[in-house]
Amino acid sequence: MASDLEGKAVLITGASTGIGAAAARAFARLGSRVAVHYNTSRDAAEKVAADVRALGGEASLVGGDVTDGSVIKRIVAETLNAFGRIDVLINNAGGLVARTRIEDYSEAFLQKVLALNVIHVALFMREVIPVMRRQKKGNVINVSSIAARHGGGAGAIIYAGAKGFISTATHGWAKEVVGDGIRVNAVSPGVITTPFHERYSTPEQLKGMQATIPMNRLGTADECAGTFVYLASDDLSGYVTGQVIEVNGGQYMP
């Protein structure tokens, strides 16, 4: 199953912790070559890279702030230098920045949320799609959020809107590049136990979220990882493009 991913070059942004790290390990088990991106958490990224190698994959570290377009160019160049190609791009980096009420919005805050969750994804597309076009094949997997479905809680509305953009743009990008042998999909995680919620959600908030989930528990990063493998594998999902796959324990159903 997913044996076609052996040797494939996979660039994962935000791969030092959480869902990105779990995805890196999942691809490693299949023999993929993984570019593990980090911003400030180099030690954590080095641990993930060591895990990738121990699990049977190859690993390369790529670091930098994805809100800087010149850094994105360098990350892509370093990945190509390490692996010679990019078969799978996973746009996982992102963040809430801060829970901010409407009356406290500043231009700097709004720009930071959009840079971290929208603009850098478009810039990675700009840099990687030409590479995949030359290869005549490739897979892009964006990361949306359940917040795109319900608009986010208090203080998280701009983040939710940014993730709504990712879901919508995934449909459009998929149509634009389908003729080039490139598939574009998205994974939309629900409430997952990662550093994201450790930072931005209180235990009381998480308890309230859990009460709305039919499975009556929060998800794990490892439970998201299989969806990335599925979407990256042409053997498993070769006829799937332009889709947003929900991984949320049944909290929201189409």
Predicted feature residues:
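The beta1-alpha1 cofactor-binding region of Rossmann-like NAD(H)/NADP(H)-dependent oxidoreductases
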Residues: 42, 63-75, 107, 222-223
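Conserved mid-core segment of classical short-chain dehydrogenase/reductases
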Residues: 73, 96-111, 134, 154-158, ...
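Catalytic Tyr-X3-Lys loop
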Residues: 103-123, 137, 141, 166, ...
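Active-site helix of classical SDR
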Residues: 125, 162, 170
